[in-house]
Amino acid sequence: MQHIGVVFGQRTQLWWDLPVVESFELLRSIYGVSPGAYKARLAQLVEQLDLGSFLDTPVRQLSLGQRMRSDLAASLLHNPKLLFLDEPTIGLDAVSKLAVRAFIRELNAQHGTTVILTTHDMDDIEALCTRVMVIGDGAILSDGPLEALRKTVHSERDLIMDLERDVEVDERDVRIIKQENQRVHLRFDPALISTPALIGRLTARYPVRDLFVENPPIEEIIAQLYRQRAIE
């Protein structure tokens, strides 16, 4: 356990009635971290996770975002090489989610910590993961880079186009997902028509004010993978 850290989004490892810092002291003793190493590590984590204002607050009085940041710090006091995160952003507001994700990215980049993340939040996957494993009915359905999953399961891309005025859009080689007023949502396969070619064709035919291209939401890709495997 010296090289492993664990955080559960719905269960804390901190002592409910103790101030945060006293829970940290107990964990320091459990993991056998020397006082000097603990002091340096704690100072670093307090700064990175902005814990200073509630270190002396009992855990039961913390907000969910504060508790999650405290749990992250607790799991890292012994500087583990492997960190397991189970639903680390569940229930968090937008600001807290961004802060937690930024910290996890920094942890991996600066310290080389391997992070294994389980989540139902697809935004967590897109923001944090370089390798994605999809599991269904106890079996591994996909294992590899996120971009490879996109290409294998769902090769299409989305193009969102804002027009200067209301115009009916009718195009070959593309599907019109939705058209609301001057905004048109198209989906196309780059294997059939390249992105530059499609953009050139659209801007020549329609009064385009703005447009952008993006990948379909990761939720759609995962759902399509489950549907494909169900058919098989």
Where are these regions (language model features)?
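Conserved ABC ATPase signature
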Residues: 17, 58-62
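Conserved ABC ATPase "signature" region
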Residues: 25, 29, 37-54
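Conserved catalytic motifs of ABC-family nucleotide-binding domains
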Residues: 79
